[in-house]
Amino acid sequence: MPQLVLLFLVYFGAAKHLGMNLSGETAAVIVFTFWGTAEMGDLVRSALISIPKHQYDSGYGLGLNKWQVYLYIILPQTIRRLLPSAVNLLTRMIKTTSLVALIGVVEVLKVGKQIIDASRYTNPTAALWVYGAVFFMYFIICFPFSRLSRVLEKSLLINREMRINEWDSRF
């Protein structure tokens, strides 16, 4: 379900059907918490499903119990597969916060629109500069997460290759 629909359902639906008068910020926190949790759960599920069955069987064949198989075999592979999707979800959630302006929450885009409206006649190019600044703010927030993801992915890949080489050198 789209986030905007969820925002409207929680913000307006809670007031009408549950008799609760939620603030825009509270409704946004509720929606982003449930949406982010559901999305992350789906990502974890798909990462776990993507691990081939023979990985589990190999662990059991080595005499490991269920917890050891998950801890030593499945979890490291799942994290490697989950990391890019999780960072993508994080950046999507950051960028989707702009929708909360539609339920009255003051955030970056709403402030930008107010600045543009106030200076429309005195500075006709204000929209370009304000939206450029908003873009730059979102970029400054999201870009470090993407870089961190890249560093972590390389680190996990290097650690994996080192373990494989160490394993191969034993034989």
Predicted feature locations:
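Transmembrane alpha-helices and adjacent helix-loop boundaries
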Residues: 1-171
